[in-house]
Every structure is written in C-alpha cells, then in structure tokens.
C-alpha cells in the first residue's frame, strides 16, 4: 500500500472527551471517528487492526474445530422471554418494536438464538459434539458509554457456543476452547493472564477471564508469583486466619467518638490499629408475590474489618442473600435506632440476621458502633459480649500479602482489561428452552453448553493501554495496521532515494510483508511524527546522504534512536526482524 492511496488523518490534539490513553491515541491516529455516544466509525487504519485481530481469532477457532456462522443482530423477543432475560437484563438490553408492534432486541449476545438453532437440528447424541461461532456486531445500551472502544455501546465480538451430551464432554470442550484462547492471546503478542472468574448472571460453574495487563485496567487481577494461581477480585478467596483467636484482654466499654463516623477516624482518635475496628454494613432481601409486590423484607447485618472492603459477588452467594440490596435509611433507623456511621451488632431495636467475615470471627477486643450517635464500643469479644457467630463466610476482597488459596505463597495484585471470557454453562439455557437430544437409550437429555467470547474491537484499545509511549501507539507486529513503513526523504528531489524506496517496497511486498510506502512528500519531522503516533513497529528511512554511503536507517518503534543498515542487505535484515 502507498500512503498517497490510503486514508491517513492524524490529529495533534485529542478531543476533550477522550479520557484514557487508548481513546486519545485512536482518535489522534485517525483509527476511529465518533458518531454518537459509544458509537464509532472504524476508519481504514483502525479497521486494518480489527481485521488482523479477527483473522487470528478465526484461524484458531477453526483449528479448534469450531465452525463459523452468523446470527441476526435483531432478534425476536420471544426467545429472550423463554429464558427470562428479556426482563432480567434491564436497560442494557435495547428493546425495539417493528411496525406491527412486535418486540425485538438488538443482540448483546446470542445464547438464545444459538440454542434455538440447535434444538431444531440436534436430534441424536450421534450429532454431538458441536461448536459454532460468529464474529458479529453487538449492542449494549450502556448508561455511560466512555473510554472509546473500551466501553462503547456498539462493538464487535466473537462469540462461540459448544454443545455436548454430558458434563464430562462439555468440560472437555471447554478446555479445548480455553487452550485455543491461550494460543490466540499468545499470537497477539500481548502480556495477559487467564484468571479464574465468577460466572455471574450468564450462569454455569466454570469460568475464566483473559485479561490484558495494563496499569490503567478497570479490573483487579489477583495472582500468586510463586505458582500458577490467578483469579479476578470477585473470585479470589480470602482464606480464614490460620491462628486461633486470642483470649479477651479488655473490658467492653462504651466510648465517646464525637463526629467520628468512619473506622479510620475512630482508629485515629483511639490510637488503635485500623484492623481492630469492625464496620457494619446493612443489607436487605425482599420476598415478592407473583405480581412482584414485596410481601416480606429481611434485614441483614454484615461485619467486616475496618480495613477490608466488601465483595458483592461473594456476599450474593451467602445463603439467603442472593439478590440483596442495601437497606434504606428508614430501614436502618428502624432496626438500629441510629444512622450509619455508628452502627453495630449490640443494642438493636429489632432483630436482624448476622453474617460475619472470617477475619472478624477471629478477632478479640474489637471496636464497633454503639448504635448511638457519637459513640462506639471498645473491647468487644465473641462468646462474652456476643454469642459466637452462626454464619461466618468470606465476604471481603483479598489484599496483597494474603495467603494464596493454593498454599504456594502470598497474593499480589495488578490491573487488567478483560478482553475474553470462557464459560461452562451446563444446561441453563437448554433447560429454559427445552433443547434436548436422544441418548443411546432413546431418552431425551438436555444439551450441555459452553460459551466463549472475545471483544474484537475492545482488544486494540487494550493493546494500546499496554503498549504506548509519549509519542503514540506501539503495536505488536501481529496486529499492527502495517508491519513496516518506508519513509523516503525528499524522493521528488533525489531519484536514487525514490528508486531505492520503490525497490525495497516491491521486495517486501513480494516477501508477503504488510508494508506501506509513505509517498506523500511530507517533511521528515511530520512524516516521522505520523508513523510514531500510528505505531507501525518497523520503520526504514531512506535518504540521499545515507544511500551515498550504502546505508539505510532502521528504527523499531520501541527504540529511542535509529541504527544504520547496509542497503544491499536491508531486505534480509528486515526478514530477520520479522522472523520470515
């Protein structure tokens, strides 16, 4: 490709609404153009990156035995109503009506449609296993779309779905896909981790996220440097303390703490470690009738150490707390006789259900709210001042330095961007939609399913978050819009420069290299700035002075300076750099 034929449109400054590096650089490099909130046009330079991502994904999906298809973007609501997701998904699911008043959705994912396809066609165990995938446009009506392609409303996703006869074969299919994902991300040339994850609303009990490591990542990734253990923050287990609880050494005392409504403030006032304070979190669960009317509400009190944060996913798995909400102020005052900031498990106005974090269950001589404004209670002990807790659970986020659940060291935490996710679904969707097959005995069985997603348009943004500097993007070779750029200096003035550039360009094309020749006639400074911003990994500069010495200049995008290369062997040199 020659630059004069291509569409190159760079900006010196990023738009004001571009908040993160990838959004800023993709806009400045002319890779995307904003059309509306969370909706972008993929410009030629950006589309080349996306197509390379798609090609790698497609090759590895095919290699893993998956078969490509395409499902509709607009889907009849009746399939989503079968699984209950038409109501459950909330406003993120874009619902529309046609001219006849019939309900449709704009797909955010396609479990319902693929399950309908398979229940029509799969009749016998002899037709299994099957694995189908698509690379297709999706839409989620994000409340606050931001960060460019990182959190857009319209995006491209690869979603695959496996179908098996039983759990064992379904989990084997899951492992085949998980290995395919590792090959995909290895080929992208990105630093990533595959981490154990919670399946969330999509269902199932086996799940991994593929996270691109980046300091700006939204997700906390928990791992053990001494082993292969890795999980996201929602999934990572905080083990119980290994030592026995110490005996009580303090009397329980009601202590004045005027205007000290946080554990940190109380600890500072009393001159005690923050980890000896206990925070009280009040939740509620509602029981409803068939019409959705609340007929009974249960109030819950959760106790966590003052230096720990509640993990909402873990809390939601405590028996009875599925679908919890935070209690309202009137509910809190009714049960505790006090506003938040001074709450505790003693002197309640009405009974509540108590759930205690593992760390709090091991505390002695701890501090909590007195259920009275401006007062806390010090020296609280289990068994003496409060009955031993009946319900103890892991309620918190782990912190760096906690023991690893695999017993092979301590945990560390880094940031990541989720770009892929694999799930074993089981029969969640096949049961809801009555998707069955006949086994060897002629008896109907529900299809065992897995689903596997990769954010095709999110991945380039994640790659930029991991690979950039003050000059612009630094693409890995595998997904760069072009692998090599040739920059001739003043080719209109120096025929030998133009000839050398054309010759090398032709040789690289013949060798199958994705090369672009910048024949726009730009000044060297402007030309170099463009390609550093765009992030092409290999740059060859051809100038008249260097040619007279038999040399070209080569610079990798990560290098601070260029190096001299013998013009006669430049092609072989570049082939070596490109591992051709």
Curated annotation (Swiss-Prot):
It is an enzyme of class 6 (ligase). Its EC number is 6.1.1.15. The keyword Endoplasmic reticulum does not apply. Keywords: Aminoacyl-tRNA synthetase, ATP-binding, Cytoplasm, Ligase, Nucleotide-binding, Protein biosynthesis. Its main location: cytoplasm. InterPro entries: aa-tRNA-synt_IIb (IPR002314), aa-tRNA-synth_II (IPR006195), aa-tRNA-synth_II/BPL/LPL (IPR045864), Anticodon-bd (IPR004154), Anticodon-bd_dom_sf (IPR036621), Pro-tRNA-ligase_IIa (IPR002316), Pro-tRNA-synth_IIa_bac-type (IPR004500), Pro-tRNA-Synthase_IIa_type1 (IPR023717). Belongs to the class-II aminoacyl-tRNA synthetase family. ProS type 1 subfamily. Homodimer. This is Proline--tRNA ligase. The gene is proS.
